[in-house]
């Protein structure tokens, strides 16, 4: 189904299909709280995470996380590899055996660092160049790889736009690096299995990368990535728009088995 909608260039349908797979594997709805995918955690337990974040954070000596726990990535950051921190959150209402099951799930969750660059032909050599991958061609442009500027805390109007040639092929290079969450556990084949206790059979962890233009609801590229053990690099080829002006492409890094771990990045282009 995903291949079919990708062939048609249907962005919204591709995202919906991926979300459907996530819901089937975790046996939860997309609109459910992501912490409810954790074994033994039900809706009546969610207040424990809010209570800890406001009243017990200093006492529990969690990691560098400073906000209320409202998602799986925030829970991972708050625990910072310490089962004792998780126990301090859940011990008022869960037994030690249930907390151990929760920790086995949380400590195995994949958290990815994502960096994005664009490789192609440019008119000038800007300061955002990452590396030189070729000399000057007949068109007068240098072929380099440029980092996509981060949008954190910067208004959309103030973004550093990447200048591209119209209707020319470029390559979006996505580097995925997995956080070391296993704390000394041996690397092995079993580690590639996803944490899906409500799914009837074992499933390998994988990721789906989708590049699209939201304004036109158009899917530009899609690629599946298997289990990320340490770090991996993925390339997505795309063409710059034929029309001149500014546009925004969006990269979606989506799990094919977990709810609440997806990431997205805007790539601001000026043609």
Model-predicted regions and their roles:
Residues 1-55, 69, 76-82, 104-135, ...:
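C-terminal helical accessory/scaffold domains
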Residues 83-111:
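A eukaryote-biased signal for short, well-structured alpha-helical docking elements
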Residues 189, 263-265:
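Helicase-associated low-complexity/disordered flanking segments
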Residues 215-223:
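Surface-exposed loop/edge segments in extracytoplasmic proteins
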Residues 223-226, 232-243:
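Short, hydrophobic beta-strand segments
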Residues 253-263:
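Short acidic/polar inter-strand loop motif in beta-rich domains
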Residues 266-271:
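Short beta-strand edge segments in extracellular beta-sheet folds
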């Amino acid at each position: 189904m995903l291949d079919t909608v990708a062939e048609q260039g249907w962005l919204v349908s591709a995202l919906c299909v991926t979300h459907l797979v996530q819901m089937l594997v975790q046996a939860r709805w997309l609109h459910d709280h992501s912490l409810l995918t954790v074994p033994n955690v039900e809706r009546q337990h969610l207040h424990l995470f809010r209570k800890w974040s406001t009243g017990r954070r200093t006492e529990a000596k969690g990691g560098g996380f400073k906000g209320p726990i409202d998602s799986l990535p925030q829970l991972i950051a708050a625990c910072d590899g310490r089962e004792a921190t998780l126990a301090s959150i859940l011990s008022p209402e869960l037994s030690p055996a249930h907390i151990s099951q929760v920790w086995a799930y949380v400590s195995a969750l994949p958290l990815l660092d994502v960096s994005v660059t664009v490789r192609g032909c440019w008119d000038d050599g800007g300061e955002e160049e990452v590396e030189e991958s070729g000399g000057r061609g007949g068109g007068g442009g240098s072929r380099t790889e440029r980092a996509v500027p981060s949008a954190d805390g910067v208004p959309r109007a103030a973004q550093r736009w990447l200048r591209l040639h119209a209707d020319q092929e470029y390559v979006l290079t996505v580097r995925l690096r997995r956080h070391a969450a296993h704390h000394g556990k041996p690397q092995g084949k079993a580690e590639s299995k996803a944490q899906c206790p409500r799914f009837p059979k074992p499933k390998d962890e994988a990721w789906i990368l989708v590049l699209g233009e939201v304004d036109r609801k158009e899917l530009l590229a899609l690629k599946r990535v298997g289990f990320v053990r340490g770090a991996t690099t993925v390339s997505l080829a795309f063409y710059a728009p034929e029309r001149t002006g500014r546009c925004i492409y969006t990269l979606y890094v989506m799990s094919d088995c977990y709810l609440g771990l997806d990431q997205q990045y805007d790539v601001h282009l000026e043609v």
